[in-house]
């Protein structure tokens, strides 16, 4: 049981404590550890995690790790005992890239390939489409190719191979190198309206909401590194994932938060 008389303020500078003969001093009022956590925690989402690197959202890429201070942005934590939503986000689009490892004559490809268009004044790539899997490819003269529109990882790879085969049949020494999924987009519906104004006020360091410019709230999750578009109707779009599990983890993290801001009629 907590005893106020046992609360001992901790100095912010250990060297100063040693110079004062072991006596600890603090310029701040005495508060318990339980109170300090309540001041620093993000409301309605449980106790924030101080131990993960993701809790320092302002950490620049490539910089050395800095232990999070009490004033550093915190990663909202999902309560461990949160109820399961039973909702599984569905993948809507997968963007992948591949290197054909050869220079390409885009005019020749556009003239001889089916379902291909090329307008260099508008876009410096051939736009090619196939029906199965239903996808679109952007083919650049450098040999780089972007494949978009697939809804499964294996379909994205299969489509990219089909485009590479089309280029090979036109006489180019195309190879299939460095295939990589760059982005996954998923969506779902939580089936209840959401108070976006309250959400942006409580989670302002992670979200932005300007209904005059865009009707959805943009929530930038730190871990996993996913961007969510949250609409008042309850529709949620998740983007920025490299693997499918990141979509699922991000939704499991955000669902208890959305439920706490459910509109009540």
Swiss-Prot record:
Regions that span the bilayer: none
GO cellular component, one term: nucleus
The organism's place on the tree of life at top rank: Eukaryota
Compartments it resides in: Nucleus
CDD domains, A to Z: TBP_eukaryotes
GO molecular function, one term: DNA binding
Keyword list, A-Z: DNA-binding, Nucleus, Repeat, Transcription
Major subcellular site: nucleus
InterPro entries noted in UniProt: TBP, TBP_CS, TBP_dom_sf, TBP_eukaryotic
Entries under Pfam families matching the protein: TBP (PF00352)
One of the GO BP terms on file: DNA-templated transcription initiation
Function: General transcription factor that functions at the core of the DNA-binding multiprotein factor TFIID. Binding of TFIID to the TATA box is the initial transcriptional step of the pre-initiation complex (PIC), playing a role in the activation of eukaryotic genes transcribed by RNA polymerase II.
Quaternary structure (record): Belongs to the TFIID complex together with the TBP-associated factors (TAFs). Binds DNA as monomer.
Family the entry assigns: Belongs to the TBP family.
Protein's name according to its UniProt entry: TATA-box-binding protein
Organism this protein belongs to: Strongylocentrotus purpuratus (Purple sea urchin)
Record lineage: Eukaryota, Metazoa, Echinodermata, Eleutherozoa, Echinozoa
């Amino acid at each position: 049981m907590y005893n106020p008389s046992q609360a001992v303020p901790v100095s912010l500078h250990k060297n100063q404590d040693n110079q004062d003969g072991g006596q600890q001093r603090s310029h701040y009022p005495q508060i318990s550890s339980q109170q300090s956590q309540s001041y620093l925690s993000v409301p309605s989402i449980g106790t924030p995690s101080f131990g993960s690197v993701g809790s320092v959202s302002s950490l620049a890429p490539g910089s050395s790790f800095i232990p999070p201070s009490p004033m550093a942005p915190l990663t909202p934590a999902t309560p461990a005992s949160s109820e399961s939503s039973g909702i599984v986000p569905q993948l809507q689009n997968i963007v992948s890239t591949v290197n054909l490892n050869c220079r390409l004559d885009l005019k020749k490809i556009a003239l001889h390939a089916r379902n291909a268009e090329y307008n260099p004044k508008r876009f410096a790539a051939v736009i090619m489409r196939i029906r199965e899997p239903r996808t679109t490819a952007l083919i650049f003269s450098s040999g780089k190719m972007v494949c978009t529109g697939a809804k499964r990882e294996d379909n994205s790879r299969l489509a990219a191979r089909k485009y590479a085969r089309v280029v090979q049949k036109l006489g180019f020494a195309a190879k299939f190198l460095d295939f990589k999924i760059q982005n996954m987009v998923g969506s779902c519906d939580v089936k209840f309206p959401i108070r976006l104004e309250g959400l942006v006020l409580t989670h302002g360091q992670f979200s932005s909401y300007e209904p005059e410019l865009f009707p959805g709230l943009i929530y930038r999750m730190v871990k996993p590194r996913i961007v969510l578009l949250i609409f008042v109707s309850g529709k949620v779009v998740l983007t920025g994932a490299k693997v499918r599990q990141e979509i699922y983890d991000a939704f499991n993290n955000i669902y208890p938060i959305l439920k706490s801001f459910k509109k009540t009629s």
